[in-house]
Amino acid sequence: MLRMRVQGVLVVLCLVTLALVGCATMQGAGGTAQPPQVKLERVEVASYFPYAAPPARVPLVLAFVYKVSNPNDTPVALEEMKFTVSFEAKPGEFFALNTPTVYETMYIPGKTSNELRVTTVLDSLIAPGNLAVTSGQRVLALGLKPGDVVKEWWEKIGDFSFGVKVSEGVAIFNGASVIVSFEDSFPKK
């Protein structure tokens, strides 16, 4: 009977020890893991076609270049990322145009940064309708016409004379165990 009790106590001690070891952090210095960082470095015009009036459809291809940094000693895996692209129509007034999503796994070693380029295509025939449907009242209140705003964006994108904003950004790392939000704008002020 005493022997069974000793065995029972040993089993419980082993289970408790295993549970505590399993809860230890993976960081070498005993610290907790820090979330990775996602920062917009720049926006590039990847492909440009001169604006043409409707019913012509003119694509505008933009590349959003991000710096994804891992402040930890152990590698992390970026598995999914999405964000909303907005253009500035008047100072401080941005309108959402697209939400690109990336489903590519990218490993970032500890204490390093990787560059991620996300390419998205905007359509000059779709953008005015998008503005009218999603932000029609706001566009009218600002005294703007969707078609004119889109024409100006297409004609001035090369100089980035208006702001481009990424918002509602979410990056998912390590099988959704780490979720990082981000937003930023370009050109940098």
What do the predicted segments below correspond to?
Residues 1-23:
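Sec-dependent bacterial lipoprotein signal peptides
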Residues 91-142:
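Intrinsically disordered, low-complexity Pro/Gly/Ser/Thr-rich segments with frequent PxxP/GP/PP motifs
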Residues 60-62, 81, 114, 164:
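Hydrophobic core residues within well-ordered beta-strands of beta-rich domains
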Residues 46-61, 69-77, 107-110, 157:
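Short, solvent-exposed beta-strand/turn "edge" segments of beta-rich domains on protein surfaces
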Residues 20-40:
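Bacterial Sec signal peptide processing site at the extreme N-terminus
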Residues 73-93:
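Short acidic, flexible loop segments centered on an aromatic residue
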Residues 122-189:
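Terminal connector regions
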